[in-house]
Design a protein with these regions (language model features):
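N-terminal helix-turn-helix DNA-binding core of bacterial DNA-binding proteins
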Residues: 2-35
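DNA-binding alpha-helical recognition surfaces that contact promoter or target DNA
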Residues: 12, 42, 97
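Basic, amphipathic "hinge/linker" alpha-helix immediately C-terminal to the N-terminal HTH DNA-binding motif
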Residues: 59-77
Length: 119
């Protein structure tokens, strides 16, 4: 389960970085996440082997269609959960931290209930 969480965190970070930056490299991800470049490089190769990202020879990293779908789903869960927590009075910092953990393990039923409750 731990690897899946790490994988999802990397995909989500690539998606978030791609909103502001055209060319994403391992060093960008390492800097954002506070990990070493070698650790990120290993993770990127694993994601590429799974067909979730493309790594060009110049080091540019992009999400594949499958990677984009996974990243978008995680990002949506993160946003909905953190917004819900803040709406019930939890501080932004705590809401974001808790959402980052919960987004990986929440059931579809519970997530949909939170999403629909917000409407």
């Amino acid at each position: 389960m731990k690897y899946q969480q790490s994988e999802e965190d990397y995909l989500e970070k690539i998606l978030m970085l791609s909103e502001d930056k055209q060319n994403i490299h391992s060093i960008d991800i390492a800097n954002e996440m506070g990990f070493s470049k070698p650790s990120v490089s290993i993770a990127m190769h694993k994601l590429a082997d799974k067909g979730l990202i493309n790594m060009e020879k110049n080091g540019v990293i992009t999400l594949t269609n499958e990677g984009y779908k996974k990243a978008s789903a995680v990002y949506e869960r993160h946003k909905v959960i953190s917004e819900f927590f803040m709406s019930i009075g939890i501080s932004k910092e705590t809401a974001l931290e808790d959402a980052c953990e919960i987004e990986h393990f929440i059931s579809e039923e519970t997530f949909n209930a939170i999403k629909n409750f917000k409407k």
